[in-house]
């Protein structure tokens, strides 16, 4: 069952990255706003957490003020941090990422569209 879940997850991450990444890029260039691509990214995070069978418990959301600038830092225990932040953080935000990630075909363009 574990192998089946892994195959399902990797299939889902590839296709969700292509479909939602392309959607984010198209929405950015047609609306010239970051809100629509961010919504695609949030969905991408939720879909991939679901496909992996991961449940995320978030504590302290009452301390998040969307009206004040803030820096959110993940401890980056795994790449699931990315999915969790996208799926659970209730504010629109921008990423800092290493240069190599922007060279990945669909992902790099989608990351640029997200700001």
Model-predicted segments: where are they?
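Mid-sequence acidic-hydrophobic segments that form the walls
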Residues: 23, 92, 113
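Conserved H-X4-D acyltransferase segment
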Residues: 5-12, 41-97
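A transmembrane-helix-recognition feature enriched in membrane-embedded lipid enzymes
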Residues: 1-57, 109-110
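Soluble catalytic domains of enzymes that build or remodel membrane lipids, polysaccharides, and related
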Residues: 96-97, 101-115
């Amino acid at each position: 069952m574990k192998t089946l879940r892994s195959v399902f997850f990797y299939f889902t991450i590839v296709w969700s990255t292509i479909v939602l990444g392309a959607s984010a890029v198209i929405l950015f260039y047609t609306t010239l706003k970051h809100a629509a691509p961010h919504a695609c990214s949030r969905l991408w995070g939720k879909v991939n957490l679901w496909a992996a069978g991961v449940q995320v418990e978030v504590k302290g959301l009452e301390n998040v003020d969307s009206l004040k600038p803030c820096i959110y830092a993940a401890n980056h225990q795994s790449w699931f941090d990315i999915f969790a932040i996208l799926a659970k953080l209730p504010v629109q935000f921008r990423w800092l990422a290493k240069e190599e990630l922007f060279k990945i075909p669909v992902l790099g363009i989608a990351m640029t569209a997200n700001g």
